[in-house]
């Protein structure tokens, strides 16, 4: 029997359009200390061009009259960041998908299910981004820094241990 919380969770199968990874263009990213309550396209490049200045403690910028302080954060070596989007178009069930990557014909695939299968693709890539904090630099305790340590931690945990 499922609890009320579990019943409300939507389950999806996510398919990556790997060809979009090759076509993704480099992007400049800013991770802001706020939430934008809009889900849709916005002409950000037209209205958000930060005048970043080097302050005594790092990068500084004003956003809607508030002082933000930040620093450049590099993606861990050997990794690349991608900006991903969910495709909005409905895939015809039972018909071949013209956008599907070639080279996967020898793999057996499950049939697609309407409202269950989702497709994502990359629109941009990045190797660094600017991490902003409100009034102070986020510092080493920022959650994003913890997330960026996971790949190296996972590699260390799963590495072969030499027998003595």
Swiss-Prot record:
Modified residues (Phosphoserine): 3
CDD domains xref list: RNase_H2-C
A Gene Ontology biological process term: mismatch repair
Principal location: nucleus
UniProt subcellular location: Nucleus
Matches recorded under Pfam families: RNase_H2_suC (PF08615)
Domain of life: Eukaryota
Biased composition annotated in UniProt, kind: Basic and acidic residues: 91-103
GO terms for cellular component: nucleus; ribonuclease H2 complex
Chain positions with N-acetylmethionine modification: 1
Assembly information from the UniProt record: The RNase H2 complex is a heterotrimer composed of the catalytic subunit RNASEH2A and the non-catalytic subunits RNASEH2B and RNASEH2C.
PANTHER family per UniProt: RIBONUCLEASE H2 SUBUNIT C
Sequence similarity: Belongs to the RNase H2 subunit C family.
Other facts noted in the record for this chain: The T6 pseudogene located upstream of SRY on chromosome Y is derived from the transcript of this gene.
Protein name: Ribonuclease H2 subunit C
Protein source organism: Homo sapiens
Encoding gene (name): RNASEH2C
């Amino acid at each position: 029997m499922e609890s009320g919380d579990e019943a409300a969770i939507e389950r999806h199968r996510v398919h990556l359009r790997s060809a979009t990874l090759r076509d993704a263009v480099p992007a400049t990213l800013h991770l802001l200390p706020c939430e934008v309550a809009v889900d849709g396209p916005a002409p950000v490049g037209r209205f958000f061009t930060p005048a970043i200045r080097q302050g005594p403690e790092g990068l500084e910028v004003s956003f809607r009259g508030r002082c933000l302080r930040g620093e450049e954060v590099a993606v861990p070596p050997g990794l690349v960041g991608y900006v991903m989007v969910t495709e909005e178009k409905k895939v015809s069930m039972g018909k071949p998908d013209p956008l599907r990557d070639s080279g996967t014909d020898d793999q057996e695939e499950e049939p697609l299910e309407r409202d269950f299968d989702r497709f994502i693709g990359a629109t941009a890539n990045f190797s660094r981004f600017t991490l902003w904090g409100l009034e102070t630099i986020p510092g080493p305790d920022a959650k994003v820094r913890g997330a960026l340590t996971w790949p190296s931690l996972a590699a260390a945990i799963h590495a072969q241990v030499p027998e003595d």
